[in-house]
């Protein structure tokens, strides 16, 4: 989780569809059935859930990482390139635990990227500094993978129907 970019998934999907007609798998704040339905409504063929699966029973992520995901919210995310030279979203509590101020991280030297060790700090990215996507608010417990998938499907079906009803209702107001 926590792979980041400066372009909204809305803009990215629209721009990509202008030149690419193949299968598009959209990610970014997708954590439940409602967001999967939204991604498909926007024109994606598939949706990718990242962070939410880190905090599952089967995940091999550190238990401290899982606990921090469950206890955190989007307000706890810091966007920085300090740890690897590449911008990413990280959990502020993990940055603080490593002895740093998440609001005072310097910019990394982009000529000295180090993807293996976290490069620009003694704390190691993905080992000590935890990544997290912005859809973290739905990560409020650590279920099994099968439970999360079942819940996502339960949410997806009515969300897809609701979108259809709402789009028909609003199209009457938009279209002549």
Identify the residue ranges that each predicted region occupies:
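Residues that cap or flank secondary-structure elements
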Residues: 4, 27-28
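Conserved active-site-proximal phosphate/metal-binding subdomains
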Residues: 9-25, 31-176
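Short, small-residue-enriched loops and turns at beta-alpha junctions
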Residues: 1-6, 55
């Amino acid at each position: 989780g926590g792979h980041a970019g400066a372009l909204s998934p809305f803009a990215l999907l629209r721009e990509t569809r202008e030149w690419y007609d193949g299968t598009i798998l959209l990610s970014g704040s997708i954590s439940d059935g409602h967001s999967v339905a939204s991604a498909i409504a926007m024109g994606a063929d598939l949706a990718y859930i990242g962070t939410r699966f880190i905090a599952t029973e089967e995940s091999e992520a550190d238990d401290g990482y899982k606990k921090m995901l469950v206890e955190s919210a989007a307000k706890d995310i810091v966007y920085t390139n300090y740890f690897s030279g590449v911008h990413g979203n990280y959990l502020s509590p993990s940055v603080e635990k490593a002895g740093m101020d998440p609001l005072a991280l310097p910019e990394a030297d982009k000529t000295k990227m180090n993807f293996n060790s976290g490069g620009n700090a003694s704390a190691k990215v993905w080992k000590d500094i935890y990544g997290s996507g912005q859809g973290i608010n739905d990560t409020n417990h650590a279920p099994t993978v099968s439970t999360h998938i079942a819940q996502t499907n339960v949410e997806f079906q009515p969300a897809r129907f609701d979108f259809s009803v709402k789009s028909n209702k609003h199209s009457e107001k938009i279209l002549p």
